[in-house]
Design a protein with these regions (language model features):
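A compact, surface-exposed functional segment
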Residues: 167-172
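Glycine-rich adenosine-cofactor-binding loop
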Residues: 153-166
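Active-site entrance/lid segments in N-terminal catalytic domains of soluble metabolic enzymes
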Residues: 1-155
Length: 172
């Protein structure tokens, strides 16, 4: 919420909204609070609206919560959906029906093309140095390769540790 109020997209992993049997759905509680807080901020600060928030979804077949989680995100109008571990057109369709955009985590050009072919709106290039993730390619090589064929939204993660690296990434 604080990031969004500061003008930066704030995100969280959907699976962090844990719930126990018989307990209220934490994801629903979180999204309600986020929407209320950001709506209030926007009403009080019309000249400085909040940035959108993003919800990260693991779309791998092993995620038994996926269907329920995407229904909740659609209900609350999550504006940005970040997907990873599988390009799933049906998830993209639900996001689009809810007026959201989909950014898909990719580690190479093959998966980038696959994600766009299956309906993602943009890409998150997970490069070497993206703490704990699978990216192995240089961020600058990966961005350059993707930009040869894709002009849509492209985010970069990995090995960006100072202003010079941010400037270099922006130049690409």
């Amino acid at each position: 919420i604080a990031q969004c109020k500061a003008g930066i997209i704030g995100s969280f992993p959907c699976l962090n909204a844990r719930e126990g049997e018989g307990e209220p759905n934490m994801l629903e509680i979180w999204l309600k609070k986020i929407n209320e807080e950001l709506d209030k901020h926007n009403q009080e600060n019309p000249d400085s609206p909040a940035a959108p928030y993003a919800v990260n979804h693991i779309v791998h077949k092993s995620n038994v919560r996926l269907e329920k989680d995407i229904d909740i995100c659609a209900k609350w109008g999550a504006p940005v959906w970040i997907t990873s571990l599988g390009a799933r057109p049906e998830v993209n369709e639900v996001a689009h029906q809810a007026k959201g955009i989909v950014l898909h985590d990719i580690i190479n050009n093959f998966f980038a093309k696959k994600a766009i072919d299956k309906g993602a709106d943009g890409l998150v290039a997970v490069a070497a140095g993206a703490g704990g993730h699978a990216g192995t390619l240089s961020p600058f090589a990966l961005i350059q390769e993707i930009r040869e064929w894709f002009s849509g939204p492209l985010l970069l993660s990995g090995s960006i540790a100072n202003g010079g690296a941010v400037l270099a990434a922006q130049a690409m």
